[in-house]
C-alpha cells in the first residue's frame, strides 16, 4: 500500500481558497491536506475598499478558512511560517513545531513597512488581516474626539490601493461625523496617477479625488515632515516580501529575486525546488520580464492552475502552464456608490460600474460561504488529527 502523501498549503490567500474549493469537490485519495495560517478569516481584497467605505460589514468580505478546510477534509493549523528548509522538505512554524511535506504551496501574500510618522496614526493597507483592528481604532478616535477639529489625511501611493483607500476612508469619516471637516493629500513618487491604467480611467480618478477634496502631489517622495502634519497616514505603497523570504537563513535555499519574492516558472513552481509551488503576491513569475502585478486578480486567476498542478504533481503527471491575461478588467470603487472601470485603452465611470463590481465580488465570495456551509461534497473516510512534527 502506497504511503500517505502530505500536501501543505501555507497562507490563506485567494489561490489557496480555490485549491480548497476544488479539493472539496474532488479530493485526491492517499493525500493528507494541511493548511497553515495565523489568519482564519481572510479578507477578499476586491471588497476591502467597499468595507473601508462602510458598504460592507467585515463578515461579508471574508473567507472562513477553518470552515472551508473542514468542508474540504483538510487539517487547519493556526500558526505562521517562521522558516523553511526546502532541502529537507520541512517548514518550521511559529509554534516551534516542524511540519514535513511532500508538496508545499505558498500563498502568503505580501506586506508593507510603513515608516514612523510622528504625531500621526499609520494605517497600512497590507497585510489585509491586520486592517480591521487598526481601522476600528481610527474610526473610534474620529467619532469620540470632542469638538469639530479637522483631520488631515495623507495617502502614500498612487496605485489602485492608494486611490481606493483614500476615497473610501474620506467617505466613511464624513458619513460618521458630517460636522467635522476632513482634508486629504495623496502623495506618490510616480509622475502619473494609476500608471498602467487607461488614460480615461486616470482622468476619472483625478476627478473623483478632486471632488472628494483630495489634493495630489505626484512625483513627490514621502518625507517625515508630511507625516508630522497629518492625523492619519494611509500607507499603500508597493508590496514587499515577508521577512522570512528576505532572510537567506530562514528561506532555506529557496530561490528569490532581489526583493525577496519567490521565483516561479510558468507552472507556478519554484525554479529551485520543484516540490514547492508559490502564487499571488509572494511570488515572482519568471516568464514575464518584470513579473506580474501584485493584484488580487492575479492570485484569483492562478488558483485553478495551481489546484490542477498540485493534483498533477501528486499523480506524477506533467504540469500545466499558467497563461496570464495580457489585459484584465480593473474596477476601482470611489466610495460614493460609483466605480471606475479600466481595461486596456477602455475607461469609464459611474454607478453602473459599482453595481457591476458589487455583483462580481459578492458572487465570488458567496462561492466559499456556500461551500463552507454545505460541508464535504463527497463522503470520505475520517482522518486522524494532525500533530505538528509528524513525519509525512
Say what each PLM segment does:
Residues 120-147, 227-301:
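FAD-site-proximal beta/loop scaffold in flavoenzymes
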Residues 76-83, 171-266:
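A Rossmann-like FAD-binding core segment of flavoenzymes
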Residues 2-3, 71-154, 234:
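FAD-binding core/adjacent interface of flavoenzyme oxidoreductases
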Residues 336-392:
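C-terminal auxiliary extensions adjacent to catalytic cores
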Residues 2-75, 154-155, 160-196:
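Beta1-alpha1 glycine-rich phosphate/pyrophosphate-binding loop at the start
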Residues 15, 109-112, 239-241, 337:
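Short glycine-rich anion-binding loops that position phosphate/pyrophosphate groups of nucleotides
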Residues 264, 282-334:
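A conserved FAD-binding loop/helix module that cradles the flavin
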Residues 48-56, 119-124, 201, 250-251, ...:
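Short glycine-enriched, charge-decorated loop/helix-capping segments at active-site entrances
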Amino acid at each position: 500500500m502506497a504511503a500517505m502523501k502530505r500536501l501543505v498549503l501555507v497562507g490563506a490567500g485567494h489561490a489557496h481558497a480555490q485549491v480548497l474549493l476544488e479539493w472539496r469537490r474532488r479530493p485526491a485519495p492517499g493525500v493528507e491536506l494541511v493548511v497553515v495560517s495565523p489568519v482564519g478569516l481572510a479578507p477578499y481584497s476586491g471588497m476591502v475598499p467597499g468595507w473601508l467605505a462602510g458598504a460592507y460589514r467585515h463578515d461579508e468580505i471574508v473567507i472562513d478558512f477553518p470552515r472551508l478546510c473542514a468542508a474540504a477534509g483538510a487539517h487547519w493549523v493556526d500558526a505562521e511560517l517562521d522558516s523553511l528548509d526546502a532541502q529537507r522538505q520541512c517548514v518550521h512554524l511559529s509554534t516551534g513545531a516542524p511540519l514535513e511535506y511532500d508538496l508545499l504551496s505558498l500563498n502568503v501574500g505580501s506586506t508593507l513597512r510603513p515608516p514612523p510618522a510622528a504625531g500621526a496614526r499609520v494605517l497600512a493597507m497590507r497585510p489585509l488581516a491586520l486592517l480591521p483592528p487598526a481601522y476600528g481604532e481610527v474610526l473610534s478616535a474620529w467619532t469620540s474626539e470632542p469638538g469639530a477639529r479637522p483631520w488631515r489625511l495623507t495617502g502614500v501611493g498612487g496605485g489602485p490601493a492608494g486611490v481606493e483607500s483614500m476615497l473610501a476612508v474620506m467617505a466613511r469619516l464624513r458619513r460618521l461625523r458630517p460636522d467635522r471637516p476632513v482634508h486629504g493629500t495623496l502623495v506618490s513618487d510616480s509622475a502619473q496617477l494609476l500608471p498602467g491604467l487607461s488614460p480615461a480611467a486616470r482622468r476619472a480618478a483625478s476627478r473623483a479625488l478632486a471632488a472628494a477634496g483630495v489634493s495630489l502631489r505626484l512625483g513627490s517622495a514621502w518625507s517625515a515632515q508630511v507625516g508630522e502634519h497629518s492625523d492619519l497616514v494611509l500607507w499603500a505603497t508597493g508590496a514587499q516580501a515577508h521577512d522570512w523570504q528576505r532572510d537567506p537563513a530562514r528561506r532555506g535555499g529557496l530561490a528569490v529575486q532581489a526583493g525577496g519574492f519567490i521565483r516561479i516558472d510558468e507552472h507556478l513552481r519554484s525554479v529551485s525546488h520543484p516540490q514547492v509551488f508559490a502564487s499571488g503576491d509572494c511570488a515572482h513569475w519568471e516568464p514575464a520580464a518584470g513579473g506580474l502585478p501584485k493584484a488580487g486578480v492575479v492570485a484569483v486567476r492562478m488558483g485553478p492552475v495551481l489546484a490542477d498542478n498540485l493534483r498533477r504533481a501528486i499523480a506524477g503527471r506533467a504540469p500545466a502552464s499558467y497563461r496570464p491575461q495580457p489585459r484584465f478588467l480593473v474596477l476601482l470603487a470611489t466610495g460614493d456608490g460609483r466605480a471606475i472601470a479600466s481595461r486596456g485603452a477602455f475607461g469609464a465611470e459611474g454607478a453602473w460600474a459599482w453595481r457591476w463590481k458589487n455583483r462580481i465580488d459578492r458572487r465570488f465570495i458567496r462561492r466559499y460561504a456556500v461551500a463552507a456551509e454545505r460541508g464535504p461534497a463527497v463522503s470520505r473516510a475520517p482522518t486522524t488529527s494532525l500533530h505538528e512534527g509528524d513525519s509525512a
